[in-house]
């Protein structure tokens, strides 16, 4: 997380291992923005933190042109900050799987072209990757998985169209 509190330490450690594949984990929810709050007021609160509600943020990202412009600016700023580390960009994903959001995913591909993006980590998980001991939890996980698979299907198609590689599965 390029905006995380341990980013300098992580960069220092990554440079020790030049063959280590390092990705950009975009922060667009539940974390700090890289840009000043005055530049992206639609995205963050007064102390520079993204909103915690992924649902609310997702609605704004999709329907508000003003918010999308600011989102594009923030995503580009995070790509640029990663670029300045001197590390080779291996892949991109987003905190809390926010790159599943079609607006964010499209912006990642668009902006990523300027930063030699070749791979995106897609949250393609097995249907029930852990034991569930109650029916309600089972149903929640099952419907979440269906939702994810719908989005990941379209993500994979778009990646193929743009010559971007992606993982087969994650756990």
Set out the residue ranges of the language-model regions.
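Aromatic/hydrophobic pocket-lining residues that form the small-molecule binding cavity
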Residues: 7, 71, 75
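Active-site beta-loop-alpha junctions enriched in small/polar residues
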Residues: 1-4, 25-31, 95-97, 125-127, ...
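Catalytic domains of cell-wall/extracellular-matrix polysaccharide-remodeling enzymes
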Residues: 67, 76-160
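Non-cysteine beta-strand/loop elements that form the S-adenosyl-L-methionine
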Residues: 21-28, 46-54, 122-123
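Glycine/small-residue-rich hydrophobic helix-like segments
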Residues: 158-171
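Active-site gating loops and adjacent loop-to-helix segments of metal-dependent hydrolytic enzymes
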Residues: 33-66
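Structural preference for beta-strand elements that scaffold enzyme active sites
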Residues: 19-25, 88-93, 119-121, 165-167
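Acidic (Asp/Glu)-rich catalytic clusters
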Residues: 7-21, 42-48, 83-84, 113, ...
